[in-house]
Structures are given as C-alpha cells and as structure tokens.
Swiss-Prot record:
InterPro entries: Poly_Biosynth_Transport (IPR050833). It is a multi-pass membrane protein. It comes from the Bacteria. Probably involved in polymerization and/or export of exopolysaccharide EPS I which functions as a virulence factor. May play a role in export of EPS I or its intermediates across the membranes. Disulfide bonds: none annotated. GO terms for biological process: polysaccharide transport. This is EPS I polysaccharide export inner membrane protein EpsE. Signal peptide: none annotated. GO terms for cellular component: plasma membrane. The keyword Protein biosynthesis does not apply. Keywords: Cell inner membrane, Cell membrane, Membrane, Polysaccharide transport, Sugar transport, Transmembrane, Transmembrane helix, Transport, Virulence. It comes from Ralstonia solanacearum.
Length: 436
C-alpha cells in the first residue's frame, strides 16, 4: 500500500506575524469570557455569581499553574530541537507529563470539594460547583497548555482559528440557552467549549508531527528531559495561581464572603483584560528568544525590548485608563449591586499595569534557562502577596485587599527581576546546543 507523504513542517513566521495572530486569538477568547461574565453577572444573583466565580477561578488557577509551568518548559526546549522525529517524541513527553499532573490536581479538587467549601463559606453550599470545577479544570488546563505547544511548533494560524472558533461557540451557547440561573449550568457550558477546543488542538498537533510509529509515542529519555525542565517551571507558577486562590479563600471566609467574591470577580475580569496582552506576548516571545541560542546579547536584547515596550507600555496605558474610568464602567455595564466594586477595580488596575511588565521580565529570564531563579523570586512574591492580603483583610479593606496586596507583591518582584537581568547584562544568552 502506498504511504502518504508526511505533512511538511510549517514555515517559521516572523515574530510580528506571530504576535498579530496570537493577540487576535487572545482578544477573541478573553473577550468572549469577559462578555460571558458580564452576562452571568446580570442573570445570576450576586450570591450565586460569587459561588460560580469561586468555582471557576479555582479550576482556572489550579489548572493554569500546571499548564503554564509545563508549556513554559516546552517553549524553552522544543524550538531548540531540529530533528522532527525527536521534536515529536519530546512534545509527546510534555503532553504525557501534563496529563498526569492535571489528573492528580482534578482528583484532589473533586475529593476535597466539601472540605474546601466548608473552609471558604462555612458550609457545603459551594461543594457542587467545586466538583464541577474539578472537571472544568481538566479542559481549561489542557486548552491553555496545548495553545502554547502550538506556538512552539509554529502552528500560530491553527491556534488562532481554534481560539476564535471557541469564542464564537461560547457566546452562541450562552445566547441560545437564555438567562443562566444556576452556577453549575454556567460551568457546564465553559466545560463543553474548552473540551472541544482541546480536542481540536490535539488533532492539529497530531497533523503537525507525523510519524511512522504513530503521533503519540515517546520515550524514557524524553520524559526525563520534560520533568527536568518542567519541575522548576511548575514550582515557579505554583507560587502564582494557587497562592492567588489561597488569598481568594481568605476573602471568601469573611462574613459576607460570597458577596465580596462577586465584587472582586467582576473587577478581576478587567484585570485579565489588561494583562492578557503581555501574557500572550510572553508565550509568543519565549520560543523566539530561546531559538536564538548563541546569538549576540544585542540581538536578544532588541527582540526583548520590542516586546517589553509594546506589551508593558500597553498594560500601563490600559491600567491608567481603567483606574480613572472605574466608576463609569460599573455604572454602564453592571447592575447597581456591583457599584462598590469600583474600588477593587482601581487597586487591580495598578496591579495589572505592574503585572504587564513583570510577566515579560519573567519570560526573558526563562528564555535564558534560569527557571530556578524565577522560582526563588516567585516564592518571595508569594510570601509578600499572602501576608499583604491577610493584613489588608484584617484592616477591613474587603474585596479591595487582593488588588492592594498584588500591587505590593509585583513592585517587589519587578525590583528583583530587574536586578537579576542587570547582573547578567554582560553575558550572552547561553542555552546550549545539546537539543540539536
């Protein structure tokens, strides 16, 4: 039987083209989630929206730190591998590692949902939503990581197509279902959309890595390499999303915890809208920076400076705009019950502007292979974040406490990151050619 010719590898595109495609996809996906939360804030009661937000943020944060950690390691390793067969087996190793980590996290959340609900709300009122969130976690984490894998494999166009399609599907389902009255139903819709996107991404990656032995085979050496690079990266991201969830749990433990969570959640959507641009640029920039192994420091600096000026500058501009317009935004887009969330939005606007700079500095350090240094700085950030959140909550700042704590922690983190990069300014990026 005649064998089908393997699909040619996608041509490498410029960083500008990759940025345009990545940002377009991010605008579509984040925009859909953003609009969805506004719709749910109108259809759900404030209490139920608080339960939904806590459950969804739990799934998103626990899944996000695993997805970001593994995909950051993949974005560092895969662009350095020239052999297509070896690149395919290494990609499979990262996918296997991701599946194992997600399975453990989802099982832990599902089994402990009642305990978490009691700790957060004083009763099991949120346990059902948290159990659904454990299933949502699997799909959301997979979708986030597989998108970064597509970037590392130069499948930017396919990634953009899937993201835009998922965004359209999410809004269509919410419109077709009419007003949503139950948090579990809203979580089910998010689950269906993310699951469909994950399946589509797997099919694209399978086509992008053809092999005579099948698309999903790997080896012990590839798994060892995946664990070696993913471990410090996952530990670093564990200092972010799970720590943020801990701070939200402290907020939920207040007397009116569900109400405070609802106020914070509607404001936090604007934080995400501001920070997704530098986050997307960071995911796109890492493979490009890593691919310049052995390049002059001047070349790498120029590429990094372009991403920093655009992503960080835009975050600063959007942060200032949202800070000044917070009152008007909540008067225009949300029911009157959410008016007091404007103060939370102002504190989060400051944090978002700082985050836009920090995330790009983190990727610059990761591109140099210094994952453990990122972990050390992230650990310091986490301690400051939790301590500041606890202090602000004790002082009675309510939902505004999280934004204030994040701002303080990001200020310290940016200082440490800047000192780290200045200390290495005289050396070229050395990633080695052991992957070639």
């Amino acid at each position: 039987m005649q064998k089908t010719a393997p699909r040619p590898l996608p041509a490498r595109i410029s960083f500008l083209s990759a940025s345009v495609l990545g940002l377009g996809a991010a605008v579509a996906s984040r925009g859909a989630v953003f609009v969805s939360n506004i719709l749910l804030a109108h259809s759900l009661t404030v209490h139920d929206f608080g339960l939904f937000s806590y459950a969804y943020v739990t799934a998103l944060n626990l899944g996000l730190f695993l997805a970001t950690g593994v995909s950051q390691a993949a974005g560092h390793v895969l662009p350095l591998i020239e052999n297509p067969e070896r690149k395919r087996t290494q990609l499979c190793a990262f996918i296997v590692l991701l599946m194992a980590l997600i399975a453990v996290a989802a099982a832990a959340l599902y089994l402990s949902s009642a305990s978490i609900s009691v700790a957060a709300f004083g009763s099991e009122q949120g346990s059902g939503a948290l159990r659904m969130a454990a299933i949502v976690l699997i799909a959301t984490a997979f979708t986030q990581a597989l998108q970064s894998f597509q970037y590392a494999m130069h499948e930017h166009r396919s990634s953009a197509t899937i993201s835009i399609g998922a965004a359209v599907l999410l809004l269509t389902m919410l419109w077709a279902m009419g007003p949503i009255r139950q948090p579990a139903l809203a979580l089910t819709i998010f689950l269906a959309v993310n699951a469909g996107a994950a399946v589509s991404q797997l099919l694209v990656l399978a086509r992008a890595t053809p092999s005579q032995r099948g698309p999903w085979r790997t080896g012990r050496e590839e798994l060892r390499l995946a664990v070696k690079h993913a471990l410090p990266s996952v530990l670093t991201t564990s200092m972010g999303a799970p720590v943020h969830w801990i701070c939200l749990s402290m907020l939920a433990a207040m007397t009116d915890g569900a109400h405070q969570l609802a106020l914070f959640s509607v404001a936090f959507q604007w934080y995400i809208a501001i920070t997704f641009i530098p986050a997307t640029l960071g995911n796109l920039a890492l493979p490009f920076l890593a691919r310049h192994a052995g390049a002059t420091e001047t070349t790498v600096r120029q590429r990094f400076r372009s991403a920093l000026l655009f992503g960080g500058g835009l975050s600063l501009a959007l942060g200032c705009a949202s800070f000044l317009l917070a009152g008007e935004i909540f008067a225009w887009f949300y029911p009157a019950e959410y008016g007091s969330a404007a103060s939370s939005m102002r504190s989060l606007s400051v944090a978002a502007a700082l985050c836009g700079v920090s995330v790009l500095l983190q990727q610059r350090i990761a591109a140099a292979g210094k994952f453990w240094r990122n972990f050390a700085m992230a650990a310091v950030y986490s301690v400051i974040y939790v301590a500041a959140s606890y202090l602000a909550l004790r002082l009675g700042f309510g939902a505004t406490s999280i934004g204030l704590a994040m701002s303080a922690a990001y200020c310290c983190l940016i200082l440490f990151q800047t000192l780290t990069l200045q200390g290495d300014s005289g050396a070229a990026i050395r990633l080695g050619r052991s992957f070639s």
